[in-house]
Every structure is written in C-alpha cells, then in structure tokens.
Swiss-Prot record:
It comes from Mycobacterium tuberculosis (strain ATCC 25618 / H37Rv). One of its GO terms (molecular function) is transcription cis-regulatory region binding. GO terms for cellular component: cytosol. This is Uncharacterized HTH-type transcriptional regulator Rv2912c. InterPro entries: DNA-bd_HTH_TetR-type_CS (IPR023772), Homeodomain-like_sf (IPR009057), HTH-type_TetR-like_transc_reg (IPR050109), HTH_TetR (IPR001647). The lineage of its organism: Bacteria, Bacillati, Actinomycetota, Actinomycetes, Mycobacteriales. GO terms for biological process: regulation of DNA-templated transcription. It comes from the Bacteria.
Amino acid sequence: MARTQQQRREETVARLLQASIDTIIEVGYARASAAVITKRAGVSVGALFRHFETMGDFMAATAYEVLRRQLETFTKQVAEIPADRPALPAALTILRDITAGSTNAVLYELMVAARTDEKLKETLQNVLGQYSAKIHDAARALPGAESFPEETFPVIVALMTNVFDGAAIVRGVLPQPELEEQRIPMLTALLTAGL
C-alpha cells in the first residue's frame, strides 16, 4: 500500500528529530549543523527547512521530542511502581535514571546554548514551560503526592528535577558514587520529614 503524503512527512520529521537527538548526543549542539543532521537522517538540507522554518524551530522541536519521550517514560514507569513499594523513592529513582540518560544531555546542550542565543531561548522557554506543567501533573498523580500542600508542590517538583539535572551534569565530569547512593534516601528523608 502506498504511503500518503502525510505519512511520508511524519516519517521524514521523525527521522530528522532522531538524527538531531543522536547528533547532539554524539558531537554536541555546537557541531550539530543542518548538514550533519540531514546527512544522518538521509534527507537534504532543503527537506529540513520544508518542515521547519528556522534551525531554532527545529531545535525547539528536538527539545519537545526529548521531553515528550521523557514524560512518557516517567509516566509509564511510575504507573508500574508496585503498590507494596514506597512510591517516593521509586519515583525519585525513575527521575534520576531519566535525567542521567544520554537523551537528557540533549536538553542540557540546548539550554546552555540558549543562554547566549535569544531565539533559541525564546523557543525553549515555551517548550520547557509546557513540560514543567506536564511533569507537575504526572508528579501530582503519584501515590502520596496529596500529602504535599498545593502551594509548595510546584517548588518541590522543580527542586527534585533540578537536583537530578545538576547531578547528571556534574556526574559527567566528576563522578561521586559515594554521594549518588545516598542522594535518594536523603531526599526521601527530607521530603517526608517536612510532612
């Protein structure tokens, strides 16, 4: 059966986004040019710009795809936490593992680049704002989340995400396994003590 134009478009965009993610993981954002990414995707540079008006739009779509995958993984894994297992340390472990993954490094690369690139910063702010709202909702659905006050819950979610993001960045340069193994028990104790 012949593919429709819409199917071909979706397949091309999916290949471009995967190539962008893989390229940034492998060589970093600074060397992830349109030519390098499109070569990896097996399409022309023109094809990229038929689907995305600017490189900033394409990088925002790349960030959105990374965040979509991470949210999907987080939500799926949280739903699989056994009822007899404490939800908080299990969810923190899932968050740690996601932020430590190579795909998350794409976000770090894009956020660092956005610090000095106003257009990229503007597009990422929108994508990250949407993601923050979705991660808040996913965290709110965790068993036991209702015990945290609504007014402080967004701060707690941001704090936990930032802790693991920061740890993932530092880990690449200065691994500290002795601290790593203590992080989740310490965070769990701090969070439950505040209830």
